[in-house]
Amino acid sequence: MVDVLVIGGGNAALCAALTAREAGASVLLLEAAPREWRGGNSQHTRNLRCMHDAPQDVLVESYPEEEFWQDLWRVTDGNTNEALARLVIRTSSQCRDWMRKHGVNFQPPLSGALHVARTNAFFMGGGKALVNAYYRSAERLGVQIRYNTPVHALELHDGEFVAALAGSERITAKACVLAAGGFESNREWLREAWGENARGEWPADNFLIRGTRFNQGVLLKFMMDAGADIIGDLSQSHCVAIDARAPLYDGGICTRVDCVSLGIVVNRDAERFYDEGEDFWPKRYAIWGRLVAQQPGQIGYSIIDSKAIGHFMPPVFPGAQANTLAELACQLGLDAEKFTHTVTQYNQACQPGHFDHTLLDDCATKNLTPAKTHWARPLDAPPYYGYALRPGITFTYLGLKVNERAAVHFAGHPSRNLFVAGEMMAGNVLGKGYTAGVGMSIGTTFGRIAGIEAARAAHKEAQHETA
């Protein structure tokens, strides 16, 4: 019997496995995916949000605890556990040396992401390099790793872990860490969560999955049925408006379309529906998936002109391009007259100001609904560009309730030897909304906590057995 069983194969699971092994525990990690698809959604990430009180290598200026907390409070509308959130924030200032020890390297942000150079540390080689570094380190330390091993159930006794069931196999351990992701890949569950809208549509049918196809929520559902304490809203998730041409699964970061704040977004009726310049893009990009999901047909269109080029990270795939608004509308399948009218109304509402995309500038509209409060410039410099957008689910927020020790709870009581990290508990910190890089901050923090706590629980059990 191993000391610690880790179920999952992404960032949180790997952090748990590594810290448990460093604490002297024998560790077995079970990854549902085959080796080539290992890493869950972490393989598609690119940065970590970090508190720091002074400049550090790739992080400029400072990003103190209180500012990080206020950013998180705003994007979640207060739907967060402050004690756990501050634990994540403080830990984020101390984790990068540990990450480097396990082979993770950092780089300055690329030119299109300089606005997060103060708040986010970017991984050299992206999330795939991070995942590969952690797996290499785990193998070197003696962590046992098994791929193609989805766990469908647990054997529990009075809120304590006994064994995991994978196929016909029963795998025992002295302690267990659950880090198997949310239910974002489970299209039937997403359909249930979003339901049918007033137009008779099932919005989730038009969702794309930004990450892994293996996060089906099987263990989350099992734990809910087993009576574990739950937190979070079934319909809340990290949901981004992504390129509508993206694949159903594993499109990753390259499907992002980051020009929304530099132009306007219209629905299939060629109507605007939200303030594109409400706040800096890293603090608002994750609301646009839900906004698009609420539109007819769950589709939107991001529209810019040539003045926007160079102010954002260009999408991997070129959008529609035209020298007239009517021609662009035709390419996008929009009514040309309605579209031209919408753009003309917007252009006329734009007030003179000093454009600065690095600040909350004074370029706003007047007498326009919805208003655009920053970076509002007329769309009058052809060629014009358009990108069709669909909701892209990254991960869901429904999860297991935890304390500062990452313990799973049953009827308000923490389990002695069952812990949880990553997406399966992120809803404790993210009740709604998102800000760039915080998912990795949560996974890294609670993965490491869960690993050390599981090792301690296993050690105590071993002492009890020998007593």
Which residues does each PLM region occupy?
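Beta1/beta-strand and adjacent pyrophosphate-binding region of the FAD-binding site
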Residues: 1-12, 28
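Internal hydrophobic alpha-helix adjacent to the cofactor/substrate pocket in enzyme cavities
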Residues: 222-229, 340, 442-462
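A glycine-rich dinucleotide-binding beta-alpha-beta segment and adjacent secondary-structure elements
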Residues: 340-432
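A conserved short coil-to-beta-strand element within the FAD-binding core of flavoproteins
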Residues: 147-160
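An anion/pyrophosphate-binding glycine-rich loop and adjacent beta-alpha core
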Residues: 216, 220-340
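Core beta-strand elements of the Rossmann-like FAD/NAD(P) dinucleotide-binding domain
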Residues: 1-2, 167-175, 414
